[in-house]
Amino acid sequence: MSTESMIQDVELAEEAFSKTQGPQGSRRRWFLSLFSFLLVAGATALFCLLHFGVIGPQREEQSSRDFSPINSLALAVRSSSRIPSDKPVAHVVANPQAEGQLQWLNRRANALLANGVELRDNQLVVPSDGLYLVYSQVLFKGQGCPSTFTLLTHSISRIAVSYQAKVNLLSAIKSPCQRETPRGAKTHPWYEPIYLGGVFQLEKGDRLSAEISPPDSLDLAESGQVYFGIIAL
């Protein structure tokens, strides 16, 4: 059935309906036509608003206003990452060629001294007052367990400018062997890492040092195993 025939059928049906209903039916048909026209006009207007983006941007703008704190925080994080830090920082590594001693180097890969920190006489010199994260790690190695009890020690000391006395800030003790040595343990290799870290109030001119014992058990075979550093907070 074609569209023209459908329209003709509708017109004939409306004409027959109007003849049977009289003036009252004609009035009802007029109200029905007006309601249909308003419905079609409203749907067309809504489609145009959606199609031309009149409604969409308002919703997006409202959504952006609702999430403005999150967007501001993300923008602040991105901006702060572009600002270079002027806080003192140091990260020194052990000299792999210094057998039997712990010698710190800053002119190596992954090592640095920045914003006033100095490495002097194997000690880190604090450039300004403030809170600092102080940390260090060492790795010991050995072969088997001797008859005597073995202790491995690692400590970080501070020599303050205010009282010129050496004071331990951090220290740790480990033993690679049990008190009762199991059978066959005298031939097994062992490795023992010790990590130290803490936050301290330091003064300008303070000197920090890291010591170990026994030095001949220090493992310097790989880079990144033995290090010492401070970070201003």
Curated annotation (Swiss-Prot):
Annotated site residues (Cleavage) in this chain: 33-34, 38-39, 48-51, 76-77
Transmembrane segments: 33-55
Lipidation (N6-myristoyl lysine): 19
Extracellular topological segments: 56-233
Keywords: Cell membrane, Cytokine, Disulfide bond, Glycoprotein, Lipoprotein, Membrane, Myristate, Phosphoprotein, Secreted, Signal-anchor, Transmembrane, Transmembrane helix
Subunit and interaction comment: Homotrimer. Interacts with SPPL2B.
Entry-annotated residues carrying Phosphoserine: 2
GO MF annotations, alphabetized: cytokine activity; tumor necrosis factor receptor binding
GO BP field: extrinsic apoptotic signaling pathway via death domain receptors; immune response; necroptotic signaling pathway; positive regulation of canonical NF-kappaB signal transduction; positive regulation of extrinsic apoptotic signaling pathway; positive regulation of NF-kappaB transcription factor activity; positive regulation of transcription by RNA polymerase II; regulation of biological quality
Residues exposed to the Cytoplasmic side: 1-32
Record-level GO cellular component terms: cell surface; extracellular space; plasma membrane
Family note: Belongs to the tumor necrosis factor family.
Function: Cytokine that binds to TNFRSF1A/TNFR1 and TNFRSF1B/TNFBR. It is mainly secreted by macrophages and can induce cell death of certain tumor cell lines. It is potent pyrogen causing fever by direct action or by stimulation of interleukin-1 secretion and is implicated in the induction of cachexia, Under certain conditions it can stimulate cell proliferation and induce cell differentiation. Induces insulin resistance in adipocytes via inhibition of insulin-induced IRS1 tyrosine phosphorylation and insulin-induced glucose uptake.
Glycosylation sites: 80
Domain THD stretches: 88-233
Intracellular or extracellular location(s): Cell membrane
Post-translational modification: The soluble form derives from the membrane form by proteolytic processing. The membrane-bound form is further proteolytically processed by SPPL2A or SPPL2B through regulated intramembrane proteolysis producing TNF intracellular domains (ICD1 and ICD2) released in the cytosol and TNF C-domain 1 and C-domain 2 secreted into the extracellular space.
Lineage: Eukaryota, Metazoa, Chordata, Craniata, Vertebrata
Record-given protein name: Tumor necrosis factor
InterPro entries in the cross-refs: TNF, TNF_alpha, TNF_CS, TNF_dom, Tumour_necrosis_fac-like_dom
Major localization class: membrane
Membrane topology of this protein: Single-pass type II membrane protein
Disulfide links within the chain: 145-177
